[in-house]
Amino acid sequence: GNGSGCYPGDPCGDGGPASKAHVANVNGLAVAPDGALYLSDANLRRVRRIGQDGIIDAFAGTGFFCTDEPCGDGADAKLAQLSYSPTGIALGPDDSLYIADGDLNRIRRVGADGIITTVAGNGLSQAPSGDGGPATTAVIPAPTSVAVAKDGSFYIANVGAVRKVGPVSASLEAGEFFLASEDGSEVYVFNSAGKHQRTLNALTGAA
């Protein structure tokens, strides 16, 4: 950052040296094993990445607030829309990045392939609910922080509570649901049409 602000939708120095870029309001930081730095630039409605070469680039978000669902889910994160104030971010063990997308009332994940999806929260701003069910159907109002464990489960700071999403739920995509096997050792994942998609280990979440 060069000490001056910028406006949503402007490049703000992306593609150039980070020291000369404009930074608006950083609410979260995460450092990758390769030394890259990710920052949640809330007022710019995007997540940005500073590589080892010192170049800053947009990583997720166009800078424009989401007005039409699904806000870019299922496509390139750089073309997605984030909330007015994305806050906490965290890196997962598989090099994915999790974003507490506060005003959209959800947790979003950018995979190593650059595709963004919602992994927790149905977007509603109501009293928290949905514990014990799929994370994507739960009500998670205004999450502020997220932390990811080694097994792929993640924790959400949410309105006076910390909520946990297990590795099985963390493996679900939007619209999917699961059923446990009779002995509880496996979980069967189905899409919204009821078609079986994959089988997961109930303990680890691995396929």
Predicted ranges, named:
Residues 42, 102, 159:
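Short loop/turn segments immediately following the C-termini of beta-strands
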